[in-house]
Amino acid sequence: MELALVGNPSNGVAKPSCNSVGSLPVVSSNAVINPPVTSAAGATLGRHLARRLVQIGATDVFAVPGDFNLTLLDYLIAEPGLKLIGCCNELNAGYAADGYARARGVGACAVTFTVGGLSVLNAIAGAYSENLPVICIVGGPNSNDYGTNRILHHTIGLPDFSQELRCFQTITCYQAVINNLDDAHEQIDTAIATALRESKPVYISVGCNLAGLSHPTFSREPVPLFISPRLSNKANLEYAVEAAADFLNKAVKPVMVGGPKIRVAKAKKAFAGIAESSGYPFAVMPSAKGLVPEHHPRFIGTYWGAVSTTFCAEIVESADAYLFAGPIFNDYSSVGYSLLLKREKAVIVQPDRVVVGNGPAFGCILMTEFLDALAKRLDRNTTAYDNYRRIFIPDREPPNGQPDEPLRVNILFKHIKEMLSGDTAVIAETGDSWFNCQKLRLPEGCGYEFQMQYGSIGWSVGATLGYAQAAKDKRVISCIGDGSFQMTAQDVSTMLRCGQKSIIFLINNGGYTIEVEIHDGPYNVIKNWDYTGLIDAIHNSDGNCWTKKVRTEEELIEAIATATGAKKDCLCFIEIIVHKDDTSKELLEWGSRVSAANSRPPNPQ
């Protein structure tokens, strides 16, 4: 059984039939570089790679030019249906490909050898940790220079050119170094297929003298890319379903919790289906927010140990059985390893494996097939949800601010909550925005993304650029702290070049707040910027941009009304001035527990 890419061969645009997220972007961006007048329409390596990107749905490539990749970029530009988006630096190009992959299912970036590759490395590591298929394309040295004793620029001064490759080997699932044409077709197709199958980044290095060359293996209209999907072992699937159904049907008050690997398994629909049929209350791990239907009446919130949604942890941890779909238990998601869970009560469902309690483990099982089959075998049980209903008390809204009273963070997020709809998506930066955005109840169709496993501050600027470019049917609302913004601010200019209309809330509290709550020190204080002034300078009267500095609730209400009204077609940048100690109670609790975990003394030797 094979999975073919589907689409319109006449225009070259196609994407995996299983990829239903996002929509293909319209070819209308000021950031797109016009194709040069060239005869590059033949069956060349560059054209083959460009066509493959279009076929899989990566119709935007985030790039930084360098002398080793310039010819390759010419072929990317020349490909109909493919846009080349120039970024301010390689790190943001990688972050943009990460955000794009979250909305579209796959992303791509293109940089130059070593100086570009090592700069994008951090972003690719983040994509690897978050299980995102990103095609990282590097323009490499001239193929004639491999195996010689020549020393090239953009290297560390050694004749061995493999340093960059070795760096990428641990953060990509496949590496292709193309320095001859004979196996270029095979290497490109294998790399792309592996990225889609494994849901991890891949590395493709193309010799700078090869992109414009033809070879018999390349065809003017490439043969469609076929990916053989993984299949469940039918016997194992039946045994696993029987064991899990017996385990859960014996429980008095079972619950379900969705984890981040639901995305990898493409099991959002299957999870929603079993949640509906089983009658169980269900929660979401913090890193999986946006992957389960929060508009469902039996959704009980975020399960995050001591900083869970009110009454959620009580129901989950008091259950006598719980089904976790795609969980990742790290020090952050477990709040310093403090979750009150028992392994013998859990059914752990990973993308290709099921473990039932302390008992049997079953491999070669797809999560989607397992959840669909299990849903038909579970007895309906609403006991845990009935218990939740008995103890539930709605959270109180924060009191309105007084006239001219300094704005509080909880007031800000009260108003952000009212902005959400199926036509919006939330990007939450590492920091206190993690905790405040977790409290937002997402309406049906509302997107949500953040980077919990890797937690690289500054990620959200590039991710906002990429997500907005991939999901043009949504308006992105980004919540970014001032410390994070200082890392990657310059690619707001790329958002303007692309004509994006995101709303960025820059929360200015004068420092690295999340680090303050883990371990305070003078290094957590940063130089304050005039952030709206910076964006005005970047805008420079070129593009649609509106900025506002806000200090009170009245000013916030007015700014949001303008951003969603008169300036709805603009990139809106709203700087929120708050007190340096204004943090969520969840961050205070989480920070103290993570600090305790970090400061554990060495085990006795």
Swiss-Prot record:
Catalysed reactions, as listed in the record: a 2-oxocarboxylate + H(+) = an aldehyde + CO2
Coiled coil, from the record: none
GO molecular function: magnesium ion binding; pyruvate decarboxylase activity; thiamine pyrophosphate binding
InterPro entries: DHS-like_NAD/FAD-binding_dom, PDC/IPDC-like, THDP-binding, Thiamin_PyroP_enz_cen_dom, Thiamin_PyroP_enz_TPP-bd_dom, TPP_enzyme_TPP-bd, TPP_PDC_IPDC, TPP_PYR_PDC_IPDC-like
Annotated Gene Ontology cellular component terms: cytosol
Cofactor remark: Binds 1 metal ion per subunit.
EC numbers for this chain: 4.1.1.1
Binding site for substrate: D67, H154, E515
PANTHER family: PYRUVATE DECARBOXYLASE (PTHR43452), PYRUVATE DECARBOXYLASE 1 (PTHR43452:SF7)
Identification of the protein by name: Pyruvate decarboxylase 1
Organism of provenance: Oryza sativa subsp. japonica
